[in-house]
Amino acid sequence: MKLKKFFALALAAATLALALTGCGSKAGDSADNSDANTDNQTGETVTVKLGVVGGIYDDLWAPAKAALADEGIDLEIVQFSDYVTPNNALANGDIDLNAFQHRIYLQNEIDNYGYAIQNIGNTFIIPLNLYSQKVSSVDELKDGDVVAIPDDLTNGGRALKVLEAAGLIELDPNAAFNPTVDDITSYKVNITIEELKANTIPSVLPDVAAAVVNGNYALDFGLKTDEAIYKDSVLDVEEYWNLIAARTADIEDPDTAAIYEKVVEAFQSSATEDVFNNTFGGYFIAVGWDQDLINQ
């Protein structure tokens, strides 16, 4: 990003404005004038590259992108086709921010690869609900029934927590937020758990007794939240909250941190919530917007 040039121009514009008016102003007013002059007089724009996974994020970030443009910030959405590359790209400086993962996934990436990146703002949580085309309630599931869950560690672990909350299994509490099937200590109903790729699970609903489906895939397949036989009850668990990530070194720079704070604030808006509710039928739920993670 052209941050040094951006702030040098902003300072020059603010100084000129003070000289012309010949009167004092509060620091906050001066900063506001500086931003306006940078946008309106010089036309200089700061570009922030945001890495995401999936076209759905274009819609989710559309209100923020429009709001930031008015402040002289061009939010460039950079699409990735997998969940491995975005953190590597962020750590290497190919992008400035990313927004595709929850806290558990980010921490696993940091632990495994040593990335110096961090959470700077909460975005949403996507429910993992239990669906069925064979039964209308959890109570109807019986011994021998097959229940499908995602096969990746983070979503699979969360799916097992859903099954536990639904009263189907018990998990070893020491497994915390990343349990595997090996951490099942007892079956309250002797179901068979089948681990599948998350994006394939909705298509196998006719063939299994029930399945835990990621909210984004449920949305793609036209599944409605009120059709679930059990709804995700762990929405208040912060470890499952999705987030915006940045390089730690950038957050330690006040000028860069100020730009990124605007990005977070632009996303955490009523306009974004309207997209959650009106475009995506409540599958995205705003969480943790009251937490200031940049200035903590």
Spans of model-derived segments:
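Bacterial lipoprotein signal-peptidase II cleavage site
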Residues: 20-42
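Short, well-ordered beta-strand elements
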Residues: 43-55, 73-79, 146-147
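Sec-dependent N-terminal signal peptides of Gram-positive bacterial secreted proteins and lipoproteins
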Residues: 2-26
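A conserved helix-loop-strand patch within extracytoplasmic ligand-binding domains
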Residues: 120-169
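Ligand-binding "clamshell"
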Residues: 108-120, 134-135, 207, 212, ...
